[in-house]
Amino acid sequence: MNSERAQVANPPTQTPVPQQQEIPLAMVHGQPVLQIPQDLYIPPDALEVILDAFEGPLDLLLYLIRRQNLNILDIPVAEITRQYVDYINVMQELRFELAAEYLVMAAILAEIKSRMLLPRPPNIENEEGEDPRAELVRRLQEYERFKQAAEDLDALPRLDRDNSAAHAFVADQTTVRIPPPVNMKELLLALQDVLKRAELFSGHAIRREALSVRQRMGDILAHLEDGKFHPFTTLFTAEEGKLGVLVTFLAILELAKEQLLDIVQEASLGPIYIKSLAIHHTNGPLQLSSDFDNSPSTHAPP
């Protein structure tokens, strides 16, 4: 009986059940974060970095409005002011040049908030007074236009960022086009054309002075003394008849044999052009000779 009373007086000690420790969501500066932040969480000492990402207080204010998809013409001043001040309060190490602008905007927001909370006088209660947010909205709209224009300009392709200029060295290549040579068949065809035109001139049979091939060679070189190409047909005078045409043709052949003429043709059956090469001879007067004449003649190059 006594033993039962002793057991009732001193009940056995129960071992406490261990509770599972709550797992933190994150660790910030060694401190666990157990609850999900209700708003954008900014860790300590981070405002300096965050504010550097904004171009000024208007940029920060516009960011808060855009983040919540708010109407810029109907800003909830109380909520925006609270969020804006939260950004300012987390700064521990002040940077006065940077903080001054943001503190001024915080004061402006606080003033607008207080003006909207104050009751209006009865005499203007039913009248449409000026919205305390009007000036701030105007500044935000103007800043938003400039910011959008800057973003559009930044999106344009930029040299050395989006593309690079290509540089290539192109050597100065002057192509010398050498016309193809003319064969005897082409010359005879051209001669036939000249003879046909010479037949158109008819006259009385009179005795003429003998035509000299050597003299005609000199006449041809004189005609071509400018060193340019001339049409083959311009060397002939149809009024001289067939005899004059043949003498001129023989003179051309003699000059070509002496390498004093350059005869070219662009295409088969195309026009023939002739250029004098006598300008390259600087060794005094040329001694022109022909198998069709008895004695040589002298021609001074231009």
Swiss-Prot record:
The record describes its quaternary structure and partners as:
Component of a cohesin-like complex composed of ScpA, ScpB and the Smc homodimer, in which ScpA and ScpB bind to the head domain of Smc. The presence of the three proteins is required for the association of the complex with DNA.
| GO terms (BP aspect) | cell division; chromosome segregation; DNA replication
* Originating species: Xylella fastidiosa (strain 9a5c)
- Per its database record, what is this protein's job? Participates in chromosomal partition during cell division. May act via the formation of a condensin-like complex containing Smc and ScpB that pull DNA away from mid-cell into both cell halves.
State a GO cellular component annotated for this protein: cytoplasm
Q: Which gene encodes it?
A: scpA
- Give the location in the cell: Cytoplasm
Q: Which family does it belong to?
A: Belongs to the ScpA family.
Main location per the UniProt record: cytoplasm
Q: Which UniProt keywords apply?
A: Cell cycle, Cell division, Chromosome partition, Cytoplasm
Q: Per its UniProt entry, which superkingdom is the organism in? A: Bacteria
Protein name listed in UniProt:
Segregation and condensation protein A
